[in-house]
């Protein structure tokens, strides 16, 4: 679960977020560009630190904790797949910062790759992949971290509608299987509404609407 009440002194627009998200809830985060959607996710993940207030994740205070210490995994629009590495190596970075995996870690990589539909690509270099395949690799790496809170910041916006729908269905299945708490920034809410059970709308650094679906 997520519970926060924080301020963030952004240069052009001071922000104040108050939000509670139950365990396993799937929340869409919508709003105009620059409204503060990504900042909200960055505060939860620890990439931005709150000016004041508190962030509780699964009832533990992580307000000023390091990114790596938080029970959160996050995927951005830019997939950050390393082109010179294989798919297996890219996914394995979720487990170890080096390129040598133990047999047990290799099995974990194969399992998540199978769930993402990219098992046959494990030995292929990332620079030989399509955009949709790269995003599947990035999503697999994110999910392999096995954190209870999943944050997605417009991860599929660069893909065509068919590829977006495929990956959104994968996210829905994984979230249900693992009972993950999901916050996802999206500009294609009408296409992805079935993925969520709640939507929040952000304007000028504040949540101005909150609706169950």
UniProtKB/Swiss-Prot annotation:
Predominant location: membrane
Enzyme Commission number: 7.6.2.15
SMART domains (alphabetical): AAA
Single GO molecular function: ABC-type thiamine transporter activity
Residues binding ATP, per UniProt: 31-38
Cell compartments where the protein resides: Cell inner membrane
CDD domains, alphabetized: ABC_ThiQ_thiamine_transporter
Signal peptide: none
The organism's place on the tree of life at top rank: Bacteria
Coiled coil: none
InterPro entries, per the entry: AAA+_ATPase (IPR003593), ABC_SmlMolc_Importer (IPR050093), ABC_transporter-like_ATP-bd (IPR003439), ABC_transporter-like_CS (IPR017871), P-loop_NTPase (IPR027417), Thiamine_ABC_ThiQ (IPR005968)
Known catalytic reactions: thiamine(out) + ATP + H2O = thiamine(in) + ADP + phosphate + H(+)
Alphabetic keyword roster: ATP-binding, Cell inner membrane, Cell membrane, Membrane, Nucleotide-binding, Translocase, Transport
The ABC transporter domain, residue ranges: 1-212
Record PROSITE patterns: ABC_TRANSPORTER_1, ABC_TRANSPORTER_2, THIQ
GO cellular component: plasma membrane
Membrane topology summary: Peripheral membrane protein
UniProt function note: Part of the ABC transporter complex ThiBPQ involved in thiamine import. Responsible for energy coupling to the transport system.
Family: Belongs to the ABC transporter superfamily. Thiamine importer (TC 3.A.1.19.1) family.
Quaternary structure note: The complex is composed of two ATP-binding proteins (ThiQ), two transmembrane proteins (ThiP) and a solute-binding protein (ThiB).
Full protein name: Thiamine import ATP-binding protein ThiQ
Species the sequence originates in: Haemophilus ducreyi (strain 35000HP / ATCC 700724)
Gene transcribed to yield this protein: thiQ
């Amino acid at each position: 679960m997520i519970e926060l009440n924080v301020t963030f002194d952004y240069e052009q627009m001071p922000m104040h977020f108050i939000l509670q998200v139950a365990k396993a809830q799937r929340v869409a985060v919508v709003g105009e560009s620059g409204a503060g959607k990504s900042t909200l996710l960055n505060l939860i993940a620890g990439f931005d630190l709150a000016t004041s207030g508190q962030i509780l994740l699964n009832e533990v205070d992580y307000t000023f904790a390091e990114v790596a210490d938080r029970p959160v995994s996050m995927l951005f629009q830019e997939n950050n797949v390393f082109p010179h590495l294989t798919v297996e190596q890219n996914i394995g970075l979720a487990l170890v910062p080096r390129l040598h995996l133990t047999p047990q870690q290799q099995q974990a990589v194969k399992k998540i790759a199978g769930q993402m539909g990219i098992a046959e690509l494990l030995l292929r270099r990332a620079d030989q992949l399509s955009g949709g395949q790269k995003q599947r690799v990035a999503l697999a790496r994110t999910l392999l971290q096995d954190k209870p809170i999943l944050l997605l910041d417009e991860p599929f916006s660069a893909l065509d509608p068919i590829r977006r729908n495929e990956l959104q269905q994968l996210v829905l299945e994984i979230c249900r299987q693992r009972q993950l708490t999901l916050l996802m920034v999206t500009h294609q809410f009408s296409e992805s509404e079935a993925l969520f059970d709640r939507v929040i709308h952000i304007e000028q650094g504040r949540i101005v609407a909150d609706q169950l679906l």
